[in-house]
């Protein structure tokens, strides 16, 4: 195809001529219009639809501040802690960059958790958005990996011993565990070798994967279109222009909304950075202001707050709790066999898996199954599109008691998070065990409870009140 220069009037502004020159060689304007400027989205977005753009903003903050931190950080066990102190005390505005990065880590998980909450409430994981959800879960897993690898870098007491505890968990895997832990650490204990490989993963490997997944997430979103609080497919009602009658272009409408949301977010973010960067020891643990000492274990080791719900599930699995897990496994297999219409071959497979699991629970210790449940508690999110059998997507049109189920699940998640930062006691362990059963019960029983009850009629068009 012959090259065609974009024609513009001779008196066109210089900026317009420059843009035309670029558009003739690179589809800049087309990309802008396809991805945002003329991307039509449902007109009834609410507060929950701010957090996707906020997550993108925080990702940019983390990348930019991370670049400046790496300029002065030394990934050496003898120099790492001192280099962080050097950044805080000697590098111009280094304290601000460090606090923005540490606050940004927690802010990232806050907006991502709220982003996922919106998806759960409005059924944004349902057909045809399964792939969007799967990319999102993969992004969440990458965020957890990125946070874990970065947690060791300050080389403080809590980061050192936290990494030691988490890596040692892999040692609970039968047969290959000890060798796997040694391979991950690169040494018999967390050392300079561990710090260097964690630094490489945190700075290069995981961010590259994360950026690729974010791009895939957005491409999948723009292919099938955005969901909305009513869970209605707006593409089913098209106007003469070929766009949904209940949609509006993202620019300028949602650009304005997002700018306002960003301004509020940055106000809160700045308040934390300038006035409470440690946030009571939750964003920056006080023990991490002490250099790592391999010979002195802290009295209580806990991960950062955004990992604590899953850490609580890990700690909840004790030898006494194994009997409850055995009973739950048998009961769930019986439920599938007697209360579903699945093919007999699948039922036989479920029984076989249940038998293997029960034998494994009797053979392997509780520590191994704690690690398994902690991993499954995250990975089970990927099954949401196929676990939810509700005839409607949005919580708005589900039975009222469904809202109670979601509220109990959310409260349980918060309670598990609180217990994860506390020292274990008999009562706290019992509460965590109950919370673990509720957490998994929410997902594993979803194929049944999500289809039960009296559902409200779903309107043909989105509900929208101008304001």
Regions found by a protein language model. Give the residues of each.
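Membrane-embedded and interfacial regions of multi-pass energy-transducing membrane proteins
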Residues: 2-107, 111-467
């Amino acid at each position: 195809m012959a090259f065609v220069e974009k024609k513009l009037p001779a008196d066109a502004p210089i900026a317009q001529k420059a843009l035309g020159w670029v558009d003739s060689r690179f589809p800049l304007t087309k990309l802008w219009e396809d991805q945002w400027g003329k991307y039509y989205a449902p007109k009834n977005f609410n507060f929950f639809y701010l957090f996707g753009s906020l997550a993108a903003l925080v990702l940019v903050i983390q990348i930019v501040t991370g670049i400046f931190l790496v300029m002065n950080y030394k990934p050496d066990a003898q120099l790492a802690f001192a280099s962080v102190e050097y950044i805080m005390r000697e590098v111009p505005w280094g304290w601000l960059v460090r606090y923005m990065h540490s606050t940004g880590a927690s802010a990232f998980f806050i907006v991502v958790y709220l982003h996922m909450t919106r998806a759960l409430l409005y059924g944004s994981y349902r057909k045809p958005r399964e792939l969007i959800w799967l990319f999102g879960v993969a992004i969440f897993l990458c965020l957890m990996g990125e946070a874990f690898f970065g947690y060791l870098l300050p080389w403080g007491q809590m980061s050192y011993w936290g990494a030691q505890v988490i890596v040692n968990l892999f040692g609970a895997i039968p047969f290959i565990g000890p060798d796997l832990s040694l391979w991950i650490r690169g040494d018999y204990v967390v050392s300079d070798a561990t710090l260097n490989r964690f630094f490489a993963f945190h700075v290069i490997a995981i961010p590259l994967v994360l950026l690729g997944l974010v791009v895939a997430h957005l491409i999948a979103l723009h292919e099938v279109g955005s969901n909305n609080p009513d869970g209605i497919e707006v593409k089913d009602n098209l106007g003469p222009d070929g766009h949904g009658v209940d949609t509006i272009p993202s620019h300028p409408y949602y650009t304005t909304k997002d700018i306002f949301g960003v301004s509020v977010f940055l106000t809160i973010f700045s308040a934390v950075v300038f006035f409470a960067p440690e946030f009571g020891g939750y964003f920056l643990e006080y023990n991490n202001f002490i250099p790592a000492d391999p010979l002195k274990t802290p009295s209580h080791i806990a991960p950062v707050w955004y990992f604590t719900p899953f850490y609580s599930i890990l700690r909840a699995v004790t030898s006494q709790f194994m009997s409850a897990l055995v009973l739950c496994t048998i009961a769930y297999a019986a439920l599938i066999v007697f209360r579903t219409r699945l093919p007999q071959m699948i039922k036989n497979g479920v029984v076989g898996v249940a038998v293997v699991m029960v034998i494994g629970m009797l053979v392997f210790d509780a520590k191994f199954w704690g690690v398994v449940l902690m991993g499954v508690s995250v990975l089970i999110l990927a099954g949401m599109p196929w676990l939810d059998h509700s005839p409607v997507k949005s919580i708005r049109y589900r039975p009222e008691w469904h809202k109670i189920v979601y509220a109990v699940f959310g409260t349980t998640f918060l309670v598990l998070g609180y217990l994860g930062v506390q020292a274990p006691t008999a009562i706290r362990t019992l509460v965590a065990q109950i919370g673990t059963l509720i957490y998994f019960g929410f997902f594993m029983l979803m194929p049944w409870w999500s289809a039960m009850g009296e559902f409200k009629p779903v309107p043909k068009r989105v509900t929208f009140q101008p304001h």
